[in-house]
A protein has these predicted regions:
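Extracellular adhesion/carbohydrate-binding repeat motifs centered on closely spaced tryptophans
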Residues: 1-119
Length: 119
């Protein structure tokens, strides 16, 4: 009986020790993956109940800073995309409702530099 990861028709599926297919959020060897309703592993942006997540090309959930096409996004330790004002270590940042980091501009009267840091 096949268990673990299975590549079928170009999609990846995860099978339990009993051979049943998993769906939803699954933590495999310390890494989070999202398997859709048919069990296929998802990649790219995922909107779940109004919260955005990013799953990289290997399907693992991204955390921390993410750059896509010259735009930066910040994903929390739980994988959710940040918007509005937030603090990372000792610095403050602002991301628009799209999740895109504000850079070299003024937001709500506060200036952010080219790195998106409030100055």
């Amino acid at each position: 009986m096949k268990t673990g990861w299975l590549n079928q028709g170009g999609s990846w599926y995860y099978l339990t020790d009993s051979g049943s297919m998993k769906t939803g959020w699954q933590k495999v060897n310390g890494t989070w993956y999202y398997l859709n309703g048919s069990g296929a592993m998802q990649t790219g942006w995922l909107n779940q109940s109004g919260t955005w997540y990013y799953l990289n090309n290997s399907g693992s959930m991204q955390t921390g800073w993410l750059s896509q096409s010259g735009t930066w996004y910040y994903l929390t330790d739980s994988g959710s995309m940040k918007t509005g004002w937030y603090q990372v270590n000792t610095k403050w940042y602002y991301s628009y409702s799209s999740g895109a980091l504000a850079v070299s501009t003024t937001v709500e009267g506060y200036t952010v530099n080219a790195n998106g840091e409030w100055i």
